[in-house]
Amino acid sequence: IGVFCLLCPVIAANGPAIIGSLAMVLLAAYICYVVHAVVVYSLTVGTLGGVSPLKFFKGMLPAIMFAFSSASSVGTLPINLECTEKLGAKREIASFVLPLGATINMDGTAIYQGVCAIFIASCYGIHLTLSQMLTIVLTATLASIGTAGVPGAGMVMLAMVLTSVGLPVDGIALVAGVDRIFDMGRTTVNI
């Protein structure tokens, strides 16, 4: 009901066609989340960790499912710690690295901010220059490092990304109604 209420003013102002656009931007974000997780994490755990990517994802499945349903990186820490220990990580190392990663390893948030900034620019008919796109990449990366690991924090930092390239902050209203759906995917990548 809450998401429906948030979407009503957006649909009233932009027409029902915005629903298809929101579905497409959600699809784009989730494709980016999956590609990032599969490519980056598989290469990292395979190359640096010496663990089979399949074994890694299977071992992390409880944490992945909890992160997806809770949308909280910090809330997932106990399960994440348990999963990493079962995969062979030493408790001393995992208990240091995981809380640090829950704060500064927000790749999903950076992806979300980049996708949403481009979507908002498109909705407003603003054509971004290469310089503006690079600024989005830089500010999204910096914002993701400083984002709290709690539900909805990425949307707050999106305002900074939009401001950095002169996009209207009002555009956040376009994605606010479906932010929870974005948040589930980005948190899964963040853990």
Segments from the language model and where they lie:
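Transmembrane alpha-helix boundary and packing residues in multipass membrane permease domains
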Residues: 2-9, 41-45, 82, 114-118, ...
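Membrane-interfacial loop-to-helix junctions in multi-pass transporters
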Residues: 31-33, 46-56, 87-94, 125-135, ...
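Hydrophobic, small-residue-rich transmembrane alpha-helices and their short perimembrane loops
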Residues: 56-76, 103, 170-186
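Helix-loop-helix junctions within the multi-pass membrane cores of secondary transporters/permeases
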Residues: 62-144
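Transmembrane alpha-helical segments and their short flanking loops
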Residues: 114-191
